[in-house]
Regions:
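C-terminal, charged low-complexity interaction regions
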Residues: 84-182
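The −1 position to Zn-ligating cysteines in a subset of zinc-ribbon hairpins
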Residues: 34
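Short Cys/His-rich metal-coordination motifs, predominantly Zn2+-binding knuckles/fingers
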Residues: 1, 37-38
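A generic structural signal for solvent-exposed, polar alpha-helical segments
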Residues: 20, 62-63, 114, 125
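Domain-level detector of nuclease and nuclease-like folds
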Residues: 41-102, 106
Length: 182
């Protein structure tokens, strides 16, 4: 029954400002999907073209990484989460400008609970425990070790799947830091 169906509409942002480039205002190549919070928070006609990364043509994933700083994390304590440029892109001002313009540090500061959960799971489900789960249960059902990691960490861990679920890059980067995503 069609009345039981519902649709989710993505919010679209113009990469090239429509006030400056009106002829591009309806071009699909100029419309970038984004969350409504980001779209309303960072709207404006400020010219940023050339100063920030274009999400269709440049890969933020290859230029920046999330990491957590944890010496020993007692229960109830906060976790320190940061975004830093990868070594080969340390002088990439466009990546830095993207982080600044979209206030990614502040936005991901709000997701520290997710980072903490990933860190906690990484402590319990290390590579040995993943192997144990795989051999004792999942292998007989036809799953792979990657599937087990996806189940445990509630995310996709292959690079190709980074756009399939929210916070996948955050999860992948933290697990890479703990050598669980290799």
């Amino acid at each position: 029954d069609a009345s039981d169906e519902y649709n989710t509409l993505a919010t679209l942002e113009h990469y090239y400002p429509k006030a400056t480039y009106p002829y591009l205002s309806l071009s699909f190549y100029n419309l970038i999907p984004c969350c409504s919070n980001c779209n309303s928070k960072f709207k404006g006609d400020s010219t940023h073209v050339g100063n920030i990364l274009h999400p269709y043509y440049e890969d933020f994933d290859e230029k920046a990484t999330f990491s957590v700083s944890v010496d020993s994390l007692p229960v109830g304590k906060d976790i320190e989460l940061s975004i830093s440029l990868k070594q080969n892109d340390i002088n990439d001002t466009r990546c830095e400008k993207s982080i600044e313009r979209f206030q990614l540090d502040k936005i991901y500061e709000e997701h520290k609970d997710i980072a903490k959960e990933i860190w906690n799971k990484a402590q319990v489900y290390n590579n040995d425990r993943i192997d144990e789960l795989y051999k004792s249960f999942y292998k007989s059902l036809g799953y792979t070790k990657d599937d087990v990691k996806n189940f445990v960490f509630c995310s996709y861990l292959r690079k190709n799947d980074i756009n399939k679920r929210n916070h996948t890059k955050l999860t992948q980067d933290i697990l890479m830091q703990f050598e669980l995503n290799n």
